[in-house]
Regions:
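Active-site pocket-lining/capping segments in soluble small-molecule metabolic enzymes
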Residues: 1-149, 153, 159-302
């Protein structure tokens, strides 16, 4: 008998970028629920179109339209979140017609309710005023590494969820002391591959914000050990801040935490599938999921 209590809700990456993967995976998830853990579910899928001025965090490439992705998430009763986490927005950017049309669409098609992940205070207040039906998530791009800063953010009523920096994932003594109303708002970033000692995380995110706005500025080059190898799930698993399936079931759920974010925008869809297998799929059914999605007798890898 597992010691979990409650349901773990996963927030998955690539709303636009990995549309084709989710279009195959979600029907399987519905038709064969026995393949997947009964104590977890998909809470949302997050992302932004390629040309979204307000976007941040990572650059996402896709030719899928907002109406297409919303049709998919609505069909499966999953919340869609826009990653509007650009940290460098100025007042003149708030009038962008494409971003406003995007928010209107996500607000109108709100069954289930859709949300937005935000960084800039300017945009937070703008969305709260103009698109009040979108729930707001405080972005991990704020790099909240100080627990007092996290507590202040959790106390803000405008945010339904707050994603702290992954280096607070194991601050168990202070996390356990939070009231349940604030525990319900903490959304842990589970599979970060970034170096635990990184001091350039904010600069990394700002470089993406500049690109989306078309602003000049230095390119960010990651100086972390092993950066040249790119993202590796095995390295993420060795990260002191990593939260795997056992930790969720045995440590976080029993302590009253239920929200878990999986990163992955900008990666390949094969890696995203590995995340779906690790976090959602019972080990004895992982091969069956692979066979349903891509693995057949004609597939050559080499």
């Amino acid at each position: 008998e597992t010691p979990h209590q409650g349901t773990a809700l996963f927030h998955l990456p690539g709303l636009f970028e990995f549309y084709d993967l989710y279009a195959l995976f979600l029907p399987l998830y519905r038709a064969h629920r026995e393949y997947f853990y009964d104590w977890c579910a998909i809470g949302s899928i997050y992302g932004a179109p390629s040309d979204c001025l307000w976007a941040g965090g990572r650059v996402e490439y896709s030719d899928r339209t907002p109406r297409e992705v919303l049709a998919l998430t609505r069909e499966y009763g999953i919340s869609a979140r826009l990653t509007l986490s650009n940290s460098l927005l100025r007042p003149e950017h708030l009038t962008d017609p494409d971003c406003n049309a995007l928010c209107r669409l996500f607000q109108e098609q709100n069954d289930p309710q859709n949300g937005a992940i935000v960084h800039a205070e300017l945009l937070t207040q703008y969305l709260k005023k103009n698109y009040p039906s979108l729930y707001l998530v405080s972005s991990t791009t704020k790099v909240l590494t100080n627990f007092n800063d996290l507590q202040r953010e959790l106390a803000r009523p405008e945010f339904r969820y707050v994603v702290p920096d992954f280096r607070l994932n194991r601050a168990f003594d202070r996390l356990a002391a939070l009231p349940q109303s604030q525990k319900d708002k903490v959304e842990f970033l589970c599979n970060e591959c970034c170096w635990f000692g990184c001091t350039e995380r904010r600069a990394c995110y700002e470089a993406v914000s500049r690109k989306n706005l078309g602003l000049p500025g230095p390119e960010h080059y990651c100086s972390a050990p092993g950066a040249a190898d790119g993202y590796r799930f095995s390295r993420a698993m060795a990260n002191p801040g990593f939260i795997g399936i056992r930790a969720i079931r045995d440590t976080y759920l029993p302590r009253g935490f239920t929200q878990f974010k999986i990163e992955g925008r900008g990666l390949g869809s094969a890696l995203i599938l590995e995340f779906l297998l690790h976090y959602l799929t019972k080990p004895e059914y992982q091969l069956a999921v692979r066979e349903e999605l891509y693995l057949d007798t004609m597939l050559d890898l080499f």
